[in-house]
Structure formats: structure tokens, C-alpha cells
Amino acid sequence: LKKKRKIYDLVILCLGRESEHYKKIFKGKSIKKDYNEVAITCHIKHNLKINAASQYFYEEGPLAILPFKNSFFSLVWSVSNNFFEKNNLNIRSIIEKKLKTILKTTSKIKISNVKSFPIYLRLSKKYHKQNCLILGEGLHTIHPIAGQGFNLILRDIKKLKELIKKNIDLGLNIKNSFVLKNFYNSRNAENTIFGVGVDITNSFFKKNKHFDRTKFALLDNIVKYKNFKKITKYISDKGFF
């Protein structure tokens, strides 16, 4: 039997950040930067009261705690390639020691689902070709220091849904419409601003003996402003636009 060729109004590629299909279909340039770092992620089970996300800045790199349900949180720790290569075999015990210091506890914590992946910045300048769209990490990969990568993806999905619904409500086809062009125009600016902004934030928090005292004095003054946390939280949750 001959295979029938299937034609779709819209094809969305969510194939992770390293798929070869992107290079075959989309030949646009992108903003790239290799941080020479590794992100270590894992799940932590505990019996403590942890309700809010928090970030800690260590000499090895920033460590984030992200609660996702009762008695569980995700951990994301960004470290240099050299540190990871030297300590990979003992990383569980190192994480446990760090957490007990951070949480000021001697209680038992369970570490599971430990993973690692290279950290780099990549912001695609081309989002679509004809009726084919990239979505997810293939579109933008940013440093995990601010925990904004997943939020950007969620906002991309929300905007795409709105544009598709608008076309359908007007009785218009999705194929050969302006849906993907409008998606690019509405999301590219924010994705680029966040990606570059997070890159600058990461550079700011890098250890620098000549700048550290001034840097932390500046941070101490900033956090005194009551509206500062409100503004940063709003931007993190809702975006700029």
C-alpha cells in the first residue's frame, strides 16, 4: 500500500533543544552563548515547611529551590564544567550537605531523579517556516538562574492559543494565515529581552573579588524598597507585554 501524504493546517515541533529537524527546516540564525556550565537538577522529599521559591548564591554557582507540592521541591544548581567533572560521583552527598546547611536541619531528606545538562543561551531569530512552528526549548534556551525558561514557554503557548482561537472564531483558516507571523511579532521581543536580561543577571552574580562588596551593598539597598519584590514577581509571572 502506498503511504498517503498527510496535509496539516499547522505543524508544531516540540522536540527538545537539540533536534536535527530544526536545522533541516529552519536555517535562520540565532543568538548563542556557551556558559561552560552544567545544570544539576533533582527532586527533594522532605518534612519541612517550604512554600516559596528561593535562590542561593554560592561560589560554585547559584542554587534554586522550587516547591511544586507538599513535602517536595525541585532543585536546580548551576556549576562550572570543571566543578561537575571533579565532583560528579559525589554530587548527591554534596547536595545533601548544602541543603542541610541552607534549611538548617538535621532531618533526613530524600534526593531522587538527579539529572544534569549543559547550560547555554540560544535565542532563535526564526520561529516558523510556512505552516511549521518551533515551540519550547527549541525556540529559546536560557540560563536557569532566574527560573524563567519554563515561564517563557507557557507564555508562548498562551499567546499561540489566543491567536488560533481568534482565527477560528472569525471563521478563518489557520494555514496560510497570519497566525504564525503574529505569534513571532508578539513573542520575539519579550523572549529576547528575557534571554539577554537573564544572561546579564548571571554575569552580575558571578564571583568577582573587585566588585562583590559594591554588588552586595547595592542589593541590600534595593531589597529595602517594598515595591521591588512586587514588580519583579509580576514580571516573572506575567512578562513585559
Name each model feature, range by range.
Residues K4, V11-T105, I111-V114:
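Conserved FAD-binding catalytic core of PHBH/FMO-like flavoproteins
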